Amino acid sequence: MSVIKMTDLDLAGKRVFIRADLNVPVKDGKVTSDARIRATIPTLKLALEKGAKVMVTSHLGRPTEGEFKPEDSLQPVVDYLKNAGFNVRLEQDYLNGVDVKDGEIVVLENVRVNKGEKKNDPELGKKYAALCDVFVMDAFGTAHRAQASTYGVAEFAPIACAGPLLAAELDALGKALKEPARPMVAIVGGSKVSTKLEVLNSLSKIADQIIVGGGIANTFIAAAGHNVGKSLYEADLIPVAKELAANTDIPVPVDVRVGLEFSETAAATEKVVNEVKDDESIFDIGDKSAEQLAEIIKNAKTVLWNGPVGVFEFPHFRKGTEIISHAIANSDAFSIAGGGDTLAAIDLFGIADKISYISTGGGAFLEFVEGKVLPAVEILEKRAKN
């Protein structure tokens, strides 16, 4: 990706406006999951080390534009950064200019409260741009949205660059999708083929093998002519599944774990894939399938993982995802994982340090995998050329 990188710039004495992703869950004024803040701290430290006058902003939740409410405030993020030892303050009225002292971080209040943010109003983009000498886009999770703080500001700022987080994300995705070391294996889980159809189509042109899981696998099992009982599947997409299976190596499970109801207490029965009864639902792959797929992963050189292979939230239907997770963790392949359920599985099985790259962007990750252009990246590339 040909973008200017923040790491390559001289920022001494420069006013630097960082668009981060600090959209963290907050309860009773306290941050309840700090992963996104922790991921942003190295970028803030780097800007300070380079002698920049640092401003950082983000969206938080879904406020109504033009109406500020206390629950939409980034104050809990400011409190967190203070506790982490930063000299930091919150600025609510910043569109007409901000005074930033050396060594301090000024957090600019929730961008989504500003009128015109979501529809990328150029006048708002110009106001953001006027605050800085250098704009740093470091929020991969919002890179698929053209908004005033992700796109407009990059259009008008004197210099627009990618922050370390965004640059690392683009490098990792490029490594997995543009020129992957082979064999390249993709794991695509989820409840519906329809929501991952573009992902499957795009990966069918790149991957040597695609492992499908969850409700998606059920549609492929039905397409192979097996009874899926009361399982979640999409009958109308069986022709699509057949076409994908004809043109791509998509192994269908040979055995499955079934239950009579979708509940944590439902008993799990393992059976051969062609023996599912009408009153049963498939909630996981069986041991034999999991071991076969683990072997495929073991021999891979690149693994892209998006989605579990079973209802791993329920202990009885967790084993398939657990075996696959550990196969990825123990593999020598370059592995990249993304998507909320995938990250939850990584946390559950304690393998975060064994995945080469964990993507922070849900929707943006999927759109990149689909081969779509991410507007916030596109404008950085355009600015790098000028």
Curated annotation (Swiss-Prot):
Signal peptide from the UniProt entry: none
Compartments where found: Cytoplasm
Gene Ontology, cellular component aspect: cytosol
GO molecular function: ADP binding; ATP binding; phosphoglycerate kinase activity
S-S pairs: none
Catalysed reaction, written as an equation: (2R)-3-phosphoglycerate + ATP = (2R)-3-phospho-glyceroyl phosphate + ADP
Enzyme Commission no: 2.7.2.3
Amino-acid positions noted as binding substrate in the UniProt annotation, renumbered to this chain: 21-23, 36, 59-62, 112, 145
Record pathway: Carbohydrate degradation; glycolysis; pyruvate from D-glyceraldehyde 3-phosphate: step 2/5
A Gene Ontology biological process term: gluconeogenesis
SUPFAM superfamilies linked: Phosphoglycerate kinase
Chain sites annotated for binding ATP: 196, 313, 339-342
Listed InterPro entries: Phosphoglycerate_kinase, Phosphoglycerate_kinase_CS, Phosphoglycerate_kinase_N, Phosphoglycerate_kinase_sf
PROSITE patterns in alphabetical order: PGLYCERATE_KINASE
Domain of life: Bacteria
Sequence similarity: Belongs to the phosphoglycerate kinase family.
PANTHER family attached to this UniProt entry: PHOSPHOGLYCERATE KINASE, PHOSPHOGLYCERATE KINASE 1, CHLOROPLASTIC-RELATED
Assembly behavior: Monomer.
Protein name: Phosphoglycerate kinase
